From Swiss-Prot:
Catalyzes the oxidation of 5,10-methylenetetrahydrofolate to 5,10-methenyltetrahydrofolate and then the hydrolysis of 5,10-methenyltetrahydrofolate to 10-formyltetrahydrofolate. The keyword Protein biosynthesis does not apply. InterPro entries: Aminoacid_DH-like_N_sf, NAD(P)-bd_dom_sf, THF_DH/CycHdrlase, THF_DH/CycHdrlase_cat_dom, THF_DH/CycHdrlase_CS, THF_DH/CycHdrlase_NAD-bd_dom. Pathway: One-carbon metabolism; tetrahydrofolate interconversion. The gene is folD. GO terms for molecular function: methenyltetrahydrofolate cyclohydrolase activity; methylenetetrahydrofolate dehydrogenase (NADP+) activity. CDD domains: NAD_bind_m-THF_DH_Cyclohyd (cd01080). It comes from Rhodopseudomonas palustris (strain TIE-1). This is Bifunctional protein FolD. One of its GO terms (cellular component) is cytosol. Belongs to the tetrahydrofolate dehydrogenase/cyclohydrolase family.
Length: 295
């Protein structure tokens, strides 16, 4: 049997529709237009693509979108001054600095400087700590999207064996916290883990977030398991053709074993942007002292 495909296109469109409805409510009932500021330093072509799609989707959801572009050789102080300006701007409810930053810039200092109330990436240590403590927090978009996708297959993740492969601050660690909030039993694997294939075969839920193309093989998957592929690995096309996007999972093999699986492209990546809109609405509500929205 081949796996059910968890379709990021459909699910992210549903999330965006809910965000748009919430934005309409905020405008009519409270006169608030949620605003997202995206800061892009340098001109990495992949980042350009993401930033463009963020801008488009923010506007389509009825929110205000502010783009700030700085040259790759911008001094750290100038970037910090922009963050301070955005922190103080009442029209801005969410601030995202596209990562990674060009060499020579200190991204930790930048992330630290973002007002935690506007940190829609959920990377500020205040938000990471609040999430780990079970307090209200803005949570990183990719883990949030990954959980939403898993929950389209399993209404409850309670008691399930979840394996998170990867321990980054952006994905692995916050994903672990969100899974614990869902009452899953969580194992974290990383580059030093012994016998990853055997560990993987015990997992009902596999989240692959390592950044290595097609590392997770089909025979690592427990039959019927749900596989969420967080990897986006850009690989040059054959014979000078277009670049290909590959996930961290060997999709063709894994889909013959898994019960449900996300594709790349068309999976978690689309959810990341949709969840950024969710976080911007959540931030706007919290900043204005309104209850947590239904998105
Ligand atoms: N501060 C920060 N926050 C981020 O959330 C962040 C970041 N920096 N830097 C880069 C990564 C990457 N990322 C993606 C967003 C959308 C897709 C996406 O839409 N992917 C589509 C198509 C992608 C394509 O065709 O190139 C898909 O998977 O189907 C992927 C990846 C957000 N990131």
């Amino acid at each position: 049997m081949t796996a059910r495909i968890i379709d990021g296109k459909t699910i992210s469109a549903e999330v965006r529709a809910r965000v748009a409805a919430e934005v309409t409510r905020l405008k009519t009932d409270h006169g608030i237009t949620p605003g997202l500021a995206v800061v892009l330093v340098g001109n990495d072509p992949a980042s350009e693509v993401y930033v463009r799609s963020k801008h488009k989707q923010t506007q389509e959801a009825g929110m205000a979108s502010f783009e700030h572009r700085l040259p790759a050789d911008v001094p750290q102080a100038e970037l910090m001054a922009l963050i301070a300006k955005l922190n103080a701007d009442p029209a801005v409810h969410g601030i995202l600095v596209q990562l990674p930053l060009p060499k020579g810039l200190d991204s930790n200092a930048v992330i630290d400087a973002i007002d935690p109330a506007k940190d829609v990436d959920g990377l500020n240590p205040t938000n990471a700590g609040r999430l780990a403590s079970g307090l209200f927090a803005l949570t990183p978009c990719t883990p949030l999207g990954s959980i939403i996708m898993a929950k389209t297959v399993h209404a409850s993740l309670e008691g399930m064996n979840a394996l998170v492969i990867g321990r980054s601050n952006l994905v692995g660690k916050p994903l672990v916290q969100l899974l614990l909030n869902e009452n899953a039993t969580v194992t974290i694997a990383h580059s030093r883990t012994r016998d990853l294939p055997a560990l993987c075969r015990q997992a009902d839920l596999v989240f692959a977030a390592v950044g290595k193309a097609e590392m997770v093989k089909g025979d690592w998957i427990k039959p019927g398991a749900t596989v969420i592929d967080v990897g986006i690995n850009r690989t040059p096309g054959k014979d000078g053709g277009k670049d290909k996007l590959l996930g961290d999972v060997a999709f063709a093999e894994a889909k013959e074993v898994a019960g449900a699986i996300t594709p790349v492209p068309g999976g978690v990546g689309l959810m990341t942007v949709a969840c950024l809109l969710v976080n911007t609405v959540r931030a706007a509500c919290a900043i204005h002292g309104l209850p947590k929205p239904a998105v």
